[in-house]
């Protein structure tokens, strides 16, 4: 998002790809639409595929409004994207819309290679240890996910972190909706990071009202600046919380955040 549309366009055109796939989020959808339109004008025969929450739940409107979008995939794309690419490779045009399948997380491979790390040197890398969210906040697209909360195997998670540590990746951001929804699991992961990371910082989001004493204690013992924690309180207005299905204990949140901040070893970002 910090790159200019010109530099993004140039990089995409220079790659000379036949298919361009874009993951669309609230923070990048506008620039993706501009870039996709430009490269389609420059290379009319390419196939442009959109995925991600900002396209999946708004697919009908996007397909009607932007004719440079060839296909939209809603939901989890690991399985369906392979099928779509096979169709394209066979010289067939894919459908304009596909519904992704709920993926068995045990079947997924680690998404990064050594070459990726070299190409993404000094960049933030994203990693997930779980999918889904146990909460149903009215304003969040995660509330529309009916697949529930699912976890990647712990062996997969630890191998992933070891890869990041060995490559000295500066910052890994977890994209888990609520990292601490399973506190025992969160404690095991945090302990592994503390015991093995030498240069890598880890960022994750938590629900502060369900923080356990054990997880707070482990986080308080971490080396300074190893962890960055994001806490989405959103509002302290009780009526507003009720209206959006966030009936959380604000006093509990306040109490737990104070305990987390006491050692001054963790950077905490609290959203209001």
Residue ranges and their predicted role:
Residues 22-24, 176-177, 206, 272:
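Short glycine-centered, acidic/aromatic-flanked micro-motifs in structured strand/loop junctions
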Residues 1, 18, 254, 262-264, ...:
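Short, intrinsically disordered, charge-balanced linker/junction segments flanking boundaries
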Residues 93-97, 201-202, 268-270:
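Acidic/polar loop patches that form or flank catalytic/metal-binding clefts of enzymes
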Residues 53-62, 87-88, 232-243, 266-272:
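Short flexible/disordered coil segments
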Residues 110-262, 266:
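Radical SAM [4Fe-4S] cluster-binding motif and immediate context
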């Amino acid at each position: 998002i910090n790159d200019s549309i010109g530099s993004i366009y140039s990089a995409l055109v220079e790659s000379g790809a036949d298919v361009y796939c874009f993951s669309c989020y609230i923070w990048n959808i506008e620039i993706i639409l501009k870039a996709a339109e430009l490269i389609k004008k420059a290379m009319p025969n390419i196939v442009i595929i959109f995925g991600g929450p900002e396209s999946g739940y708004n697919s009908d409107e996007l397909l009607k409004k932007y004719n440079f979008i060839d296909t939209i995939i809603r939901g989890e794309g690991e399985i369906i994207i392979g099928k779509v690419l096979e169709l394209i490779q066979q010289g067939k045009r894919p459908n304009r819309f596909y519904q992704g399948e709920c993926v068995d997380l045990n079947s997924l491979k680690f998404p990064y290679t050594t070459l990726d790390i070299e190409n993404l040197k000094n960049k933030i890398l994203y990693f997930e240890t779980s999918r889904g969210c146990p909460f149903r906040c009215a304003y969040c697209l995660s509330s529309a996910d009916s697949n529930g909360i699912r976890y990647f195997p712990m062996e997969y998670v630890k191998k992933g972190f070891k890869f990041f540590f060995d490559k000295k990746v500066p910052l890994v951001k977890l994209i888990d909706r609520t990292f601490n929804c399973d506190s025992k699991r969160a404690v095991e992961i945090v302990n592994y990071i503390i015991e093995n990371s030498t240069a890598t910082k880890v960022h994750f989001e938590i629900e502060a009202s369900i923080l356990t004493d054990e997880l707070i204690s482990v986080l308080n013992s971490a080396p300074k600046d190893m962890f960055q924690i994001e806490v989405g309180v959103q509002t302290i207005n009780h009526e507003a919380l009720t209206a959006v299905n966030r009936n959380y204990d604000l006093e509990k949140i306040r109490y737990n955040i104070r305990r987390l901040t006491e050692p001054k070893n963790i950077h905490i970002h609290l959203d209001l």
